[in-house]
Amino acid sequence: MRLLICLTLLGLVCGNPVQLTDNSIALQNTYDNYVLPGESFPTFYDVQLFFDPEYEASFNGTVAIRVVPRIATQEIVLHAMEMEILSIRAYSDLPSDDNLNENLFSSYTLATDDTHLLKIQFTRVLDALQPITVEISYSAQYAPNMFGVYVSRYVENGATVSLVTSQLQPTFARRAFPCYDEPALKAVFRTTIYAPPAYNVVETNMPLRTDSLKSDRPGFTKHEFQDTLVMSSYLLAYLVSKFDYISNENNPTYDKSMKVFSRPGTQNTAEFALDFGQKNMVELEKYTEFPYAFPKIDKVAVPDFAAGAMENWGLVIYREIALLVQEGVTTTSTLQGIGRIISHENTHQWFGNEVGPDSWTYTWLNEGFANFFESFATDLVLPEWRMMDQFVINMQNVFQSDAVLSVNPITFEVRTPSQILGTFNSVAYQKSGSVIRMMQHFLTPEIFRKSLALYISRMSRKAAKPTDLFEAIQEVVDASDHSIRWRLSIIMNRWTQQGGFPVVTVRRSAPSAQSFVITQRRFLTDSTQESNTVWNVPLNWVLSTDVNFNDTRPMAWLPPQLAAEAVQVPGLQNAEWFIVNKQQTGYYRVNYDPENWRALAKVLNDTHEIIHLLNRAQLIDDSFNLARNGRLDYSLAFDLSRYLVQERDYIPWAAANAAFNYLNSVLSGSSVHPLFQEYLLFLTAPLYQRLGFNAATGEEHVTPFHRNIILNINCLHGNEDCVSTAETLLQNFRDNPTQTLNPDIQTTVFCSGLRGGDVDNFNFLWARYTATQDSSEQSILLNALGCTSNADRRDFLFSQVIASDSQVREQDRHSVLVSAINSGPDNMNAALDFVLENFANIQPNVQGLTGTTNILNAFARTLTTQEHANKIDEFSNKYANVFTAGEMASVAAIKENIAASITWNSQNAATVEAWLRKNFGTDGASTVSASITIIISAMVAIYNIL
């Protein structure tokens, strides 16, 4: 019945369409090029869609596209994916045309390959620049994998409720309606949605027209929306639901309409999103000096969503856990993530929506700026969160994935849908954001801000390339009194068009000299690999005689050369130590001569607070990674790390935790591993006493993150008090599940309780997981369940990844394996065997377009042995023909990282063992034991005083 109604209406809209038999014309496309030929472009779309969430098989639609040929042509080429074309009509769009009502349509071919090209032929040659309108009616399947238009579900009062929503970025607008699905081909969109009357919340990018609600078709209500501004097709969004909302209508802190839609009964959890979202938009408008363009910016929390969120212009869609805050359930980490994601998506309203990329080769023009501003703009609203301090930790994390030869550059040419999706990786996000932060500092913050304001105003509603950005910045630099050594495009082309990053080695030219000798090499985790890639590197430094970490402007530049460069440094001869790269604002590592490393270790162990906390984090991260790479003796890194027993700030400890996690992986099972564990317990003892399991009233925002690091180290590495306390807390929680257990420590407590293999603990937590509808609680539980050491329960958990009746949402299934991979060697090896055996079934069940890369990237951080290398080779050979571009890149990174770890064992294991045995073995046991007692007593006393 509904299908007949839809088809009847399509006939009325299209006039007298030519009926087609799809089987006779669905031909294999012969285009070698995935990019549209560019011989025509759209200016206007009128899209009508029929959505019924209860009829989950398919939906119908019609689209009328105003098309302008660039040249005289007899065909146009656009995109359509996984749909049946029902009819096509084409006619002249010029009132002066004598044949205005003539149907120009002749035939069409629809590619069955992944080009998704729809070629439409006409009865005559179309004149250049003379517009026509092409009307297409079609039937399409709801997307099975949350990319396109799809159905999501939730349970309310025991009944399943369905809704329709969408995710069209990057290449899935073509799955919603035939269109020119490339970001540069912008147009105005008019949308009409037909939906059953029971679905009271029907939304798209623009508000409803004043006379929009009409019941002109039985069983459907017609919702007509205002025309958009010129925009890309991937930014469209749809929602047909029974949601409720809160809004800023009665108490606005921002002058545009904002609503937050979510499941009925969850409106109280949307208050933070509404409040922070408005304040964040105000700050972004101030910063960019450019007003938000649409009349509304609504936010939607949906139960099933592939990404964390999507910046659709005017209707931003989020996964529930990325938007809703439940007091007593949402962790501090999740709350911070919500703030970051809201800021990220708000930023896209300028970087991506107002100014979009010319093609997905330049994904970073969207995602790099959104990554930078997700911290920077959050910091403008909530400075107490210390987001720009935490940014350095995120940069250090991306160093790991950027330190392999196979990594792609920031600007990376892509053509196929698989390649395009693969560009949405850590390079486009975290690396690009880090390079943008470096640019902010070497330009100065005010020149950077003015440059972005000029870029946005100049490129508004246009498709941009990096040259457009660089030219705007250069114009502002030229008008200022600030100078840089080269033109900006020369500097930035090396950072954006080459993969990887440098390690800058700095030495005194002589013991009493006033100059540095500086060289650069590409930093690669595998020390057996080499590269001649070089960069234009901004340099600044601090001397022990002039400790000023605040001025981060360049004091010199390192040219793009392998040869050594001499840099004059007045006063160097009087300095006991020096540090290059203030606040780690430059995207590079720094190595020194052994004498300077020893001097830095001394000052850290004596008076560490004289060094900026971000540079303390830098010294920890650089030293251990340089040692891992074979460029620094591990004994120097360990000597420096001793100071951590005095370190109270979270940021250096986050850097240290990453270094220690790698060492734990490569040392696990070795005879020296117990000594390494002893060292970690020694370093964390004062903080374990100070932080414990209980949160203090009014503690700093980042303290829960710090507490989790300390508790995880202690419970994992044998602190009996930590293990017994965690087990007691879990048992008390089981005995009284309604009691309050700080959500910030729940994953640690649950994980510790599961490591013992207790089946009852697992069953209790699994029952809670399946019973709760709260996405925050589900995340906590799923991340803990992977810690189980019970093989039977682990196998059951893994089965949920591929089971047809899985109780884990598709978007979360990859977390089952990731949590197991991260929990320890036994579960990691079990997960590897499971993936090796079942990857073909895993792909379509874990949000296959991105979930598998999350799993593979977790392996890239943890696999270390020759046995692992053999299994990955087997895995690669077995599934090579089904890998996506992103999966292939992840597998290549795994292989490089394993090779580096095998090299590590031959080059570094003996040095690490010698240092640990000297300091924590039989030879040093009595001295260390006495030192531990004295230091811990002193530190606890100091902490209690402070």
Curated annotation (Swiss-Prot):
**Quick one: where is this thing mainly located?**
membrane
Q: Which GO terms describe its cellular component?
A: cytoplasm; extracellular space; plasma membrane; side of membrane
Co-factor binding comment: Binds 1 zinc ion per subunit.
Q: Which domain of life is it from?
A: Eukaryota
| Keywords attached to this entry | Aminopeptidase, Cell membrane, Disulfide bond, Glycoprotein, GPI-anchor, Hydrolase, Lipoprotein, Membrane, Metal-binding, Metalloprotease, Protease, Signal, Zinc
A GO molecular-function descriptor: peptide binding
- Give the reaction(s) catalysed: Release of an N-terminal amino acid, Xaa-|-Yaa- from a peptide, amide or arylamide. Xaa is preferably Ala, but may be most amino acids including Pro (slow action). When a terminal hydrophobic residue is followed by a prolyl residue, the two may be released as an intact Xaa-Pro dipeptide
Which cysteines pair up through disulfides? They are 715-722, 751-787
Q: Classify the protein's membrane topology as the record does.
A: Lipid-anchor; GPI-anchor
User: Which residues take part in binding Zn(2+)?
Assistant: 344, 348, 367
Query: Which top EC class is given?
Result: hydrolase
A Gene Ontology biological process annotation? proteolysis
Q: Which residues are glycosylated?
A: 60, 550, 605
Cellular compartments annotated = Cell membrane
What name does this protein carry?
A: Aminopeptidase N
Q: Where is this site: Transition state stabilizer?
A: 429
Q: Which InterPro entries match?
A: Aminopeptidase_N-like_N, Aminopeptidase_N-like_N_sf, ERAP1-like_C_dom, M1_APN-typ, Peptidase_M1, Peptidase_M1_aminopeptidases, Peptidase_M1_dom, Peptidase_M4/M1_CTD_sf
> Which EC number(s) are documented for this chain?
3.4.11.2
The family annotation for this protein states: Belongs to the peptidase M1 family.
Q: Which PANTHER family match?
A: AMINOPEPTIDASE, PROTEASE M1 ZINC METALLOPROTEASE
Region forming the signal peptide: 1-15
Please report a single Pfam family linked to this protein.
Peptidase_M1
Residue positions of the active site:
345 (proton acceptor)
